[in-house]
Amino acid sequence: MTISEARLWRAIQGRAVGARFRRQVPIGHWIADFASFDPRLVIEVDDTSHEFRDESMRTEYFESQGFSMLRFSNMRIAMELPEVVGTIEAWVEYIRLHREAPE
């Protein structure tokens, strides 16, 4: 876990953003940095070692499994952690308000 991932984890663990996230979650053959199953939201922390093609394939797969995706750079987490946490909280609320009702 990178320093940025650890900082983000401390900020979101235990329903701090309105949802329960787990870290290093296997979803299919990928591992999400952080994932919530209610609502279905994956958070990825990017560094310079990630390849664009790999990121694109991961995003496509997670979305095909019904997850929304948020991506933050290590730099953004380091410089703007409160804003990152606010964005996550807003997405949790948005997904819950707009998910389809069961038939």
What residue ranges belong to the model's regions?
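Solvent-exposed, charged helical/coil patches
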Residues: 1-19, 64, 92-103
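Basic, amphipathic alpha-helical patches used to engage nucleic acids or provide basic targeting signals
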Residues: 1, 23-94
